[in-house]
Amino acid sequence: MALVSRVNSPLRSRLATERYRRQHDELSALSASMEQKLEGVQAGESATDLRRLLAQYSGKLSVHLRMEDEALYPRALGGGDASLQRVAAALQRDVGPLHEEFQRFLEAWPSAATIESRPRDFAMQLARILRTIARRMQREEAELYPLVDALE
């Protein structure tokens, strides 16, 4: 299940949100890779590669959230556009609980062995958290990024 897909356009490289969109693409690609590996783990294969991908995903997500927190959201909230401020405030409010949920997920699955011991539980929880994050990225791209790009 592809969680976020998008066609690259020449305009994207000129947008203020280009690097955030690229990070979304990278996170989506890692999601797809994890989903592929998950099939093998559910069939009894080692979860080592899957746990490594999850660690990569976690690292990229942390960098992405930090960049948004330090640059994107302050810019959006500090701009003069009331619509942009409203959208940014709503999205920023939601990110804390989402990040906490993801951290709890990581703590519950600290190793390949824990994944291998309960692959079905892991699969259900992974699918749920990835869907939640994908929906969040889609909202940013549909609601926030066009408003930020319009400031340019």
Regions found by a protein language model. Name each.
Residues 1-152:
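Small-residue-biased structural context
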